[in-house]
Every structure is written in C-alpha cells, then in structure tokens.
Regions:
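Terminal leader/tail segments of proteins
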Residues: 1-155
Length: 155
C-alpha cells in the first residue's frame, strides 16, 4: 500500500468512504466492520467513523458531554463498556446532526484508539495520535508529523 502524508490532506477536511477492515477491541471485539468513513484533514492522521450498528450490543452509552467542530458540527460522546463491566470514559463520539458536507456521518461512531485496548486497520495495530483531543488512527502508511502533541495545537 502507498504511504500518505498528513500534510497532503485537505483543509477543510475530506470525507471518504472506506471498505477497509476496521476492528476495535475492548473486553473482546467491540466493533468489526468494513462499513466506515474516514475523515482526512491537514496535519491529522485519519479519523475513522464506524457503522454504529456494527458495535457490540450495549457497548455505547451516551454521556452529557459535547464539543463543536467547525466542519462537522456538534459532537456527542459515549462511554464504552466492556462485557466485564470495565468502562472507557468518553471513548467514542458521533455527530447526530452533522453539517451538510458531513451528512453521511450520521449513524457512524468514531473511537479513540488510546482509550480502548487495541484498534486495527486491515490487520495492522494502530498507534494513537498524541494528546487527548483528537482520535486519529496511525498506521505504517501514515507519515507525519501529526497534530495533537504538545506545541502543535496551533498548527
């Protein structure tokens, strides 16, 4: 597969359908799907939005927390619960009423790889994006440096 530079991604961000096999683990398989989108934005590794229906039943619990993205709109957050009762706080988010350019994200959920046990893109375990705000999935195909770490929020 070809490498991608995060500096070649557009701003405003681009929404792209993907059939890549995506897997998230938290107390077993949390989600496994080929029904997903990825958002590509300058300086950011891809953020994957996975079909909500493909998550393990009762894994996502909406919490009273939100943020606003200038491109996608208001995000709603979820805690993720493992079968053993372990909880990952604010570990996923979605856009219940996304802006016009991102309407296709309705019904799709993104996961912070740093808050669950492991995430995979086509069998490759991802690295997490630095910081605690962005939820990019970094594979060996992604070339940085990536926004998120100390001193990069103004990029």
């Amino acid at each position: 597969m070809e490498t991608e530079s995060v500096w070649a991604y557009p701003r405003p961000p681009r929404l792209e359908k993907t059939k890549t096999l995506l897997v998230g683990e938290f107390g077993g398989i949390l989600v496994e799907t080929r029904d997903a989108f990825r958002v590509l934005e300058t300086s950011h590794p891809p953020t994957y939005y996975l079909q909500a229906e493909d998550f393990r039943e009762n894994a996502l619990t909406a919490v009273s927390s939100s943020t606003f993205c200038e491109w996608k709109g208001e995000a709603r957050y979820f805690d993720i619960q493992a079968p053993n009762g372990k909880i990952a706080t604010r570990a996923a988010w979605d856009y219940p009423s996304p802006s016009n350019n991102f309407l296709k994200l309705q019904g799709f959920v993104a996961v912070y790889p740093s808050k669950v046990e492991r995430c995979f893109v086509d069998g490759e375990e991802v690295s997490t994006q630095e910081g605690d705000f962005y939820g990019g999935w970094i594979t060996s195909r992604i070339q940085g440096p990536c926004k998120g770490g100390p001193g990069t929020l103004g990029w």
